[in-house]
Curated annotation (Swiss-Prot):
Gene label: ogg
Domain of life of the native organism: Archaea
Active site: 132, 150
Listed name of the protein: 8-oxoguanine DNA glycosylase/AP lyase
HAMAP family for this protein: Ogg
Function: Catalyzes the excision of an oxidatively damaged form of guanine (7,8-dihydro-8-oxoguanine = 8-oxoG) from DNA. Also cleaves the DNA backbone at apurinic/apyrimidinic sites (AP sites).
Cystine bridges: none
Catalytic function, reaction form: 2'-deoxyribonucleotide-(2'-deoxyribose 5'-phosphate)-2'-deoxyribonucleotide-DNA = a 3'-end 2'-deoxyribonucleotide-(2,3-dehydro-2,3-deoxyribose 5'-phosphate)-DNA + a 5'-end 5'-phospho-2'-deoxyribonucleoside-DNA + H(+)
Protein family per UniProt: Belongs to the type-2 OGG1 family.
Length: 209
């Protein structure tokens, strides 16, 4: 296990190199929380698309499709995903079309005081959304209670013996791993959704969203 001093030193190093970008990203997330329902839905669609793919591909899809996430019918959305070489074009197009039922409630959900209930609502109502994707969406709209426990974060935790298993698929395992990560974030006086950005940079060398 790497020491707390090592992580602290890495955080300071990242702050010196990428501090401005991280603060800019955090401000962007906070601004997004105040957006209209259609902008929020585009972010939700991005989070649906990043599951089992890469953030880079999700960003490419988001930039290319844009308003099409809530305007296009299934066939047209599917074709647009094919154009950007998105692998799961059938299933994810279906998920995004189905998720439109929640558009009118998104502004309410992202501003709920009970962030954990907000996450459960997303999971219950949006097919294709699990704990990781719901946490991703909420973090990206300025709810920093949640980190995104993707393969990079889980790898960091497993390799440094904070957790025993890389399997993160079940509800129980995800929430157990989340508790461990949140306790680690607390040691460094950071919100999980901010600490996540630093650990992700340690693992990937990138600051995305």
């Amino acid at each position: 296990m790497i020491s707390s001093d090592y992580i602290k030193d890495k955080i300071l190093e990242i702050e010196n190199i990428q501090g401005n970008l991280i603060r800019s990203r955090i401000s962007e997330f906070k601004r997004l929380k105040k957006s209209d329902k259609y902008t929020l839905f585009k972010e939700l669609s991005f989070c649906i698309l990043t599951a089992n793919t890469s953030a880079e591909l999700g960003l490419k899809c988001q930039a290319y499709i844009n308003d099409g996430f809530y305007r296009l019918d299934y066939n047209d959305l599917r074709e647009e995903l094919i154009k950007v070489h998105y692998r799961f074009y059938n299933k994810r197009a279906s998920y995004i079309i189905g998720a439109r039922d929640i558009i009118d409630d998104l502004e309410y959900i992202v501003n709920m005081d009970d962030h954990f209930r907000a996450r459960e609502i997303l999971i219950e109502r949006v097919k294709g959304i699990g704990y990781k994707e719901a946490s991703h969406f909420l973090r990206n709209v300025g709810v920093f209670d949640f980190a995104i426990l993707d393969k990079h974060i889980i790898k960091f935790m497993k390799n440094n013996y904070y957790i025993k298993y890389e399997n993160n698929s079940s509800r129980r395992r995800y929430l157990e791993n989340e508790i461990v990560f949140n306790e680690l974030a607390k040691k460094f006086n950071m919100e999980p959704g901010v600490f996540d950005l630093y650990i992700w940079y340690i693992e990937t060398g990138k600051i995305l969203k």
